[in-house]
Structures are given as structure tokens and as C-alpha cells.
Amino acid sequence: MKIAVYGKGGIGKSTTSCNISVALARRGQKVLQIGCDPKHDSTFTLTGFLIPTIIDTLQSKDYHYEDIWPEDVIHKGYGGVDCVEAGGPPAGAGCGGYVVGETVKLLKELNAFYEYDIILFDVLGDVVCGGFAAPLNYADYCVIITDNGFDALFAANRITASIREKARTHPLRLAGLVGNRTSRRDLINKYVEACPMPVIEVLPIIEDIRVSRVKGKTLFEMVGFEPSLNYVCNYYLGIADQILSQPEGIVPKEIPDRELFSLLSDLYLNPIGGGGQKKNNKENLLGFTRI
């Protein structure tokens, strides 16, 4: 099974992806996580360091695939999760989609692409072009990470459009949304009411999740010396269980941009009728920052 994880930049995709990967491994799956971001920090909390990228390795070998061994590009992370970082083209040049394609090509050359029960693609930011959407060409399911803010849901809606487009030619389905770092879900509920899709899980604001990223550890590793965090791991184990159940998934129909803006703005301007929130919370409601 191949899963592509998308969401607004900075929403917590990599931290969530790493914890889901470990949760899947805890359920007995052989897991490979592929980071698809030029920052090549997707697997940082699994390995504790920035591993060499596929592109760096290919360049060092002058793109001679026959000179590359699996251990050159596949690194062992916490919990037995294997890790790969695709890397990216130089800033302002090249295409991220090409890099993803080269990564998959190399893994196939190494007979590694089909050796895993689960391959999880952790993909940068919003989908703004076909290059960023390239991992969807290989995925069975897409999982969208969001929060209860306007910007994150707007990005989720754009990703939804890409899923629908790719599903025309690939057996791709949306597994659902995962809410991250949110104490409320009124905007999420409003969105899925207008654009029906499953909500896999909603994680509350938990400071230890952010701290784990800085420490370069997954929550599962931190539980070893902080047993009180076990309840956080249960969120990720629940997500893993839903993925392993091979949900039917859906091909979603995105909401037109102006309609989505109007939908969420109505909740913002009419908080009592739209969700019962006080007007003095409006910055957080829309995900904007007061300057």
C-alpha cells in the first residue's frame, strides 16, 4: 500500500507522517517513508539527523545507477522504519516532480520499491503544479493534514482537486482528513459538510508533539522516558489501524474557491449561527495572525 500525505506548509505533515510510520511498523508492517521536500527533513524525527538525499547521491555517482547500493540511500530509522529523502532541484530551477520520479526509478532499480508493505510519501506544502502532485501517481490513498484554520482548509481543498484529477487515470482515493494542533473543529466540520469526506482523526494542541520535532524523536521514542505520553501515541495507532483497514476511500469534489471563501467567511461573520464562537477569537478562527 502506498500513501501520500499532503497539507499546508508548516501544518505538521512530517511530524505526523513519522509517527504514523512508526505506528504502522508497530502493527507489524514493513514501512518506508519517502520525504519529498528540498529541505530533506521529513525523516528527521525517525533518524535524528538529516540523511543524504537521492539527488545528492545520484550526483555524486554521476547518475550511474549501477554504482548505487540500497544502503547508500535507504537509512534505518526508529522502530525499524526505513527512510529515504528525495531532496529537490536547486532553488529557482528544476522540478520537484522530476526528483520524485528519479527517486522511484532508483528504488525500482534497487528492487526496493516493491519490498515494503507500506510506502508513505511525505510531500511538501500545497499542490500548485503537476510536479508537486507527482507522488499521487504512485499512491493508493491520500491523507490530508489540516487544522481548524482557513488557510489549511483552503490548501486541503486545492489538494482535493488534485486527487480528483489524478483519480481519472490512477486508482487513487482520499482516505480522509487528519486534523492537527486544533482545539476546535467547527471549520473542519463546516468544510466536510459542504465537501463530504472522512475525518480520520483530530489531534488536539499537544505541546509535546512540537517538542518531539525539535528533539528529533517520535512520540513513540519519547514514551520510553515519559510514559505519560502514551495517550498521544494512541492517536497515531488509531490512524494506522484505519489505514490498514483499507478503507473504501472517496474521489472528492472540491469546492470552488469563491464558494469556499464565502462558506468559511459566513461562519466568521456570524459566529453564533455558524459555530457559536465569540467574535474576539476571529483571528484564530480563520487561521490569520494579527499584525
From Swiss-Prot:
One of its GO terms (biological process) is photosynthesis, dark reaction. It is an enzyme of class 1 (oxidoreductase). Gene3D superfamilies: P-loop containing nucleotide triphosphate hydrolases (3.40.50.300). [4Fe-4S] cluster binds at residues 95, 129. SUPFAM superfamilies: P-loop containing nucleoside triphosphate hydrolases. It is found in: Plastid, Chloroplast. This is Light-independent protochlorophyllide reductase iron-sulfur ATP-binding protein. It comes from Pinus thunbergii (Japanese black pine).
